[in-house]
Amino acid sequence: MPGPRPRKGPKTSGQGAETAKQLGLFVEFNPEDMLLGVDETEDDGDLEAELLALTGETASRSRKPAPKGQAPLPMAHIEKLAADCMRDVEEDEEEEGLEDDADLLTELQEVLGEDEEAGLLDGSEAASPDLCEEKTWDNTELPVEQAACQQAVPAAAQAGGPRGLQALLEERIRNYREAAASAKEAGEAAKARRCERGLKTLQSQLATVRKGGKICEDEIPPPVALGKRPPAPQERAIKNPEIDSPGPCAMEPGNLSQPESSLPAIAPLPDSDPDPQALLLARQREYKAAALDAKRAGDLDRARELMRIGKRFGTVLEALEKGQPVDLSGMPPAPADLKALPQASKASSATQGLSPAVEQMQPVMASDLPATPVAPAEPTTVLDALQQRLNKYREAGIQARANGDERKARMHDRIAKQYQDAVRAHQAGQKVDFAELPVPPGFPPIPGLEPRKGSEQDSVAATLATAQKLASEDAALVDDDEESDTPAQAPLAKKPAQTLVSPSHLLTEPKASSSKESLSPSVREQVTLLEARKLQYQRAALQAKRRQDLEQAKSHLRVAKSLEAQIIQARAGQPIDLSKVPSPLTDEEGDFILIHHEDLRLSQKAEEVYAQLQKMLQEQQAKCLLFSKQYMHQGNVAETTRFERLAEDRKKQLEILQLAQAQGLDPPSHHFELKTFQTVRIFSELNSTEMHLIIVRGMNLPAPPGVTPDDLDAFVRFEFHYPNSDQAQKSKTAVVKNTNSPEFEQVFKLNINRNHRGFRRVIQSKGIKFEIFHKGSFFRSDKLVGTAHLKLERLEKECEIREIMEVLDGRKPTGGKLEVKVRLREPLSSQDVQTVTENWLVLEPRGL
């Protein structure tokens, strides 16, 4: 048997900690020392030896001896570090020799030339505000000019890149530009965007080649097919016989300020000439350079006028970039060919002499025809007559804009757009309703139409009526994009808005329009209402299209088309069901965007006043629309129009209030007026064959024996004895638990026949019976709480009955109440006319 194991001696203190440290436990470490190597930064022999080897110095006697066991850094590593240091020095020396690089010097000279030209106009900013304005415009158009200049720079002037590659890129750029223009004219937006992306790639590659860089030829976009472009109108352009390419864009910066004075007279370009964009850019730069020379010579008036003329080239260039044909027959001549302008005393007359030349250079959408004379000649064809009237309205719009009457100018521009659509439709072989086109005063009728008696007076009256209508609609139309400095802007290609009729109806259309005057007043009111509603939906479709909401735009256009059919039906004397006319649109989002500035903060009281006023205006607008809808279903056109105008007025007042709040103004002064309205109540959402029963709530219902009021689980059952007692319509509500005042709010649809004799008998004698029950448990049946009875005689003159009935136990009142409603579309025997008195909010106009 083994003996007892010998006892171990007691462990000395601290021996367990040493064992833990040997195992890696409780090791103290400093993260900063691990990252920075603090222990190795001082008194490290290896690092000192490496430093001495790099610097070539000898070790100091006072230094500590390097620890044994660590070898110095190998010499091969040291030589590699030294070679790297020497290599950096050589690269710096190579960069110092870049000043002899011809490519970089050429690029630097181009940049400095543009900066010098821009800096020459800075000296006279204080003396001439107009020149400062023109300088700002010049800087904004600089990228366009640089792009055109880069396109026109000859290959001999480029220091880097092969000429063949550069010529290929330039030819490919012209190909993509023509393809993009052709796609835009054909209405192919996707193809136009693809061509524009390829054009940007080609332009960046051309810029790289011109700077001497290299590009991968495989990345050059391939040529695109131009396709069959639509027959464009004949264009008249200008040409300098001595200039075969847009050379003025390739002028050196030093010669920019010296315009060429040897330019010959302007001659029309043949069909084989290049794109007129380069000619326009060249002429624009000539005018800028001439303005710079005039400014240096001290002739600020001439410089200002030349800059104004140069500005107007931008409008034509924009139209040209959009793919629209441009008439260059009226382009101003070279600045050297213009006579010197007089001093400031005659500056205004010189402006009038130079401006028409530029105003004639505008985009055109039809064939080039002579200007309309003061006394128009007798047209031979329909196209001639349309073009004469189009030119007349264009001239009227330009003249109105020159006089500062933007409202009248926009009106003439819209009429001109109608004629442009008619010209396109006629050229495409479509049929146009010429009777709807306004006729300028004194113009002969369109060939093929029989002149009516007193045609001159009728045309003048029709023109005045159309002008007045367009002027009144100007404030509501959202066409701010048309308010530009362009005398006449070519519209986008779209379908003509005129009604298409057959040629046989052209001669009978005046008779049909004259028969409109013989319509009865009620029918005339219906036609006016339908036309206004159609115009409203067309405007809404246009706004939805501008917001890129194509589905909403299509929906509004379908409604407008259906209204057009109803208008034709009304003019033909057929009856119209106004209850089926679409309701007026409500703009929940508003017609404008409010910009709230951070520095404009209203007081808390002002914010509350604005909120209350806006709430009241919104409620009044909703009431007006509701009343208008009710009268529309009754067929009362006059009252419908009246309430629609009131709703429009409330909407305008709300917009004015929101705009004033956004500008940080104080709330406007306002007062209230008592207005009394005679309204006809109708529930248009109901059909004539249904009646709605609404069980709203129970109040303080009695509990059956053995049930406390808080444990009442109530539900309501009803019976409507129609069409007969055996086939009575029955239903019940859901169970509301644990309350004696349940809220049901349930709607039941009951089928009825308003003209049935049995329905009238039920309405007058029986009514609807209600029974309130307490829901039983699994082994207990439902317990009756009480009954109620609703009489329906008031439905003869009212379309809604609201009753709070007493709950009875047999014939004994229980103290409980039951609230119910019954609704019909309209009363059975008469109209539900109600008199409503409103406190009408009126905002007082602000003083100037």
From Swiss-Prot:
Coiled-coil regions, chain positions: 165-193, 600-626
CDD domains named among the record's database cross-references: C2_Freud-1
Chain spans, region Disordered: 1-21, 53-75, 217-276, 326-353, 433-460, 476-523
A GO cellular component annotation in the UniProt record: nucleus
InterPro entries: C2_dom (IPR000008), C2_domain_sf (IPR035892), C2_Freud (IPR037772), CC2D1A/B (IPR039725), CC2D1A/B_DM14 (IPR006608)
Comp. bias intervals (Pro residues): 438-448
Biased composition (Acidic residues): 476-485
Biased composition (Low complexity): 487-498, 509-522
Molecular function in Gene Ontology: DNA-binding transcription repressor activity, RNA polymerase II-specific; RNA polymerase II cis-regulatory region sequence-specific DNA binding
Database matches in PROSITE patterns: C2
Keywords (A to Z) from UniProt: Coiled coil, Nucleus, Phosphoprotein, Transcription, Transcription regulation
Basic residues composition-biased segments: 1-10
Modified residues annotated as Phosphothreonine in this record: 586
Residues in C2 domain copies: 666-805
GO biological process terms held by the UniProt record: negative regulation of transcription by RNA polymerase II
Coarse class of the protein's main subcellular location: nucleus
Subunit structure, interactors included: Interacts with CHMP4B.
Family membership: Belongs to the CC2D1 family.
Protein name as catalogued: Coiled-coil and C2 domain-containing protein 1B
Organism: Mus musculus
Name of encoding gene: Cc2d1b
